[in-house]
Amino acid sequence: MLKSEVSKQITTPLTAPAFPRGPYRFHNREYFNIIYRTDADALRKIVPEPLELGEDPLVRFEMMAMPDTSGLGSYTECGQAIPVSYNGKKGDYLHMMYLDNQPAIAVGRELSAYPKKLGYPKLFVDSDTLVGTLDYGKLRVAIATMGYKHKQLDLNEAKEQICRPNFMLKIIPNYDGTPRICELISAQIKDITVHEAWTGPARLQLFDHAMAPFNDLPVKEIVSSSHILTDLTLPSPEVIYDYLKK
């Protein structure tokens, strides 16, 4: 392969890349979100400067089922997002994400800054209950439940929930371990159609695990829940802060 051809490739292996080029379009992307109140001191230890926490110590536990994703296929994802602000702009800091699809993990980490790891989340309906679970290896890490489609949620309110700016850390070392890239990244979903949105009674259980430490942000009180069905396009990220520039 010519040098000029190598430089045009998106990733490795050269003849079987881990993921194709975007854009990445999601059809029937399903969200199950639970916003809960947690320990303020625990949040302060986690959220990186220059992001700022609000007065209310909140976390969004999110489950996402993505059965039809261009280039990436079908997968499910689970994570925690923390409401923050940057220079007065409100959004969510993406703390952890666990999913069951290698191409989605690779593209999320390489082309953006999504904090993705391998896990085994599931989102399903059990009788009259929407259920989300996360296993890390063979151990259960989280169980979320919500009454299935109890009360309709305003579609504009649902869109606002999904379209909040996301903030992420991009960290890549040099080959000797010294810092090479250390940036704060922002991305915001704008191309979206919300088909349905619901709310209902919800509960969330988190279990201690060293490698999936969701319970480091313990559940003190459930604030709200939502079940939202969408089509959307994944946005391109932008650098908003460089930790290595003095």
Swiss-Prot record:
Record-level Gene Ontology MF annotations: acetoacetate decarboxylase activity
Tell me which EC number(s) this protein carries.
4.1.1.4
Quote the catalytic residue positions. K116
Keyword set for this entry?
A: Decarboxylase, Lyase, Schiff base
**Catalytic activity as recorded in UniProt:** acetoacetate + H(+) = acetone + CO2
Q: Does the keyword Lyase apply?
A: yes
- Do you know which SUPFAM superfamilies this protein is assigned to? Acetoacetate decarboxylase-like
Query: Is Aminoacyl-tRNA synthetase one of the keywords?
Result: no
Source domain of life is Bacteria
NCBIfam families, per this entry? PRK02265.1 (NF002614)
Q: Which HAMAP family match?
A: ADC
**What is its biological role?**
Catalyzes the conversion of acetoacetate to acetone and carbon dioxide.
Protein family membership: Belongs to the ADC family.
Q: What is the protein name for this chain?
A: Acetoacetate decarboxylase
Q: Which organism is it from?
A: Clostridium botulinum (strain Eklund 17B / Type B)
